Amino acid sequence: MRQALPLVTRQGDRIAIVSGLRTPFARQATAFHGIPAVDLGKMVVGELLARSEIPADAIEQLVFGQVVQMPEAPNIAREIVLGTGMNVHTDAYSVSRACATSFQAVANVAESLMAGTIRAGIAGGADSSSVLPIGVSKALARVLVDVNKARTTRQRLTLFSRLRLRDLLPVPPAVAEYSTGLRMGDTAEQMAKTYGITREQQDALAHRSHQRAAQAWAEGKLAEEVMTTYVPPYKNPFAEDNNIRGASTLADYAKLRPAFDRKHGSVTAANSTPLTDGAAAVILMTESRAKELGLRPLGYLRSYAFTAIDVWQDMLLGPAWSTPLALERAGLTMADLTLFDMHEAFAAQTLANLQLLGSERFAREVFGRAQATGEVDDAKFNVLGGSIAYGHPFAATGARMITQTLHELRRRGGGFGLVTACAAGGLGAAMVLEAE
């Protein structure tokens, strides 16, 4: 094992995560229908600051992400600053790393803290699958540009006459990889076939996720980290995730047909995470700044790692690649972890990554190591359920996982937790957290 890379400031301060919060997560076109991501971001950051009782001017930087970009608000981070009563001079910029976006936001704020340019910042993300940037065809877009330059009505009519009916149809955001044309579900099907993951195994994992998430809500474990929201027409509060199927049975999962490979596939809507709306954020600061403000941190950021692999085959293996690097940089092994939380984009993807983490062959061929990263103990894995149950607002999931894991570590008396996610483009992210 290489030498650990401690995440500390020049003064030796650890990177403290003092609080975290999220909105409830809503299935597409339900509770947050019509609410853009920027408004969801304002909701969560405004409430996070109000609950923390941290002076607004103590926050020196806000890094926020949004995967499904809205042209009218390209820098969501700055709009959140301007829309929440934060100091107008607060530095703010936006990031995007697909499903690992808020992992990236957290890393960026941590790096600013370690560089000494700030002492406190907010990181997070928001996405809406209900408010989408519906575009126009390339043919229509080109004609519209040319029409603006045309000088006569005749020239304009000539340009429009070149269009076909199909050119006038709206164009929704792409759901496939730009470089390959593959959808995420296509990749999940690849992984199921490559690693011999059955439909029954996928359905069992999905059922486990929903059961554990339902239990977490029933036991009140999520109440402190999920805010109550009010949206137009402001008649009813929305306080709990609405995708969780606590009453489902395994037989219910078996009824669904494959969603991607309809003839030979095993990936269904039930063993995949749904399109979701929501936002999440965390406050980070140096350990000494937290003490100055009289705050007890939820925990500390021990290490992080980002990786990238090829996109043509089994590209959602990011956790299997990033987890060993994050553990190495933290100076830990799999056995040292109290909790292990993996983003469940698809049950097939999750099970494939778990399989490779326990594979000596994978460790030897990819990392040149004699031993596997380690089997993930089921008693430590996604103990409160995962994204299949909660949903997945792309840019918000990382912040949800970090906050959820730190709260659970605190309930268990402290220890180390690892959170990890795959992301489009063959990307992966992992972070090691510590709670006392």
Swiss-Prot record:
Record GO terms (molecular function): acetyl-CoA C-acyltransferase activity
Residues the record marks as active site: C99, H392, C422
Main location, first listed in the record: cytoplasm
InterPro entries named among the record's database cross-references: Ac-CoA_C-AcTrfase_FadI, Thiolase, Thiolase-like, Thiolase_acyl_enz_int_AS, Thiolase_AS, Thiolase_C, Thiolase_CS, Thiolase_N
Record-level GO cellular component terms: cytosol
Pathway connected to this protein: Lipid metabolism; fatty acid beta-oxidation
E.C. numbers: 2.3.1.16
Locations listed in the record: Cytoplasm
Substrates-to-products reaction catalysed: an acyl-CoA + acetyl-CoA = a 3-oxoacyl-CoA + CoA
A GO BP entry: fatty acid beta-oxidation
Keywords tagged on the record: Acyltransferase, Cytoplasm, Fatty acid metabolism, Lipid degradation, Lipid metabolism, Transferase
PANTHER family membership: ACETYL-COA ACETYLTRANSFERASE, CYTOSOLIC, ACETYL-COA C-ACYLTRANSFERASE
Complexes and interactors: Heterotetramer of two alpha chains (FadJ) and two beta chains (FadI).
Role summary: Catalyzes the final step of fatty acid oxidation in which acetyl-CoA is released and the CoA ester of a fatty acid two carbons shorter is formed.
Family: Belongs to the thiolase-like superfamily. Thiolase family.
Protein name: 3-ketoacyl-CoA thiolase
UniProt organism field: Salmonella typhi
Gene: fadI
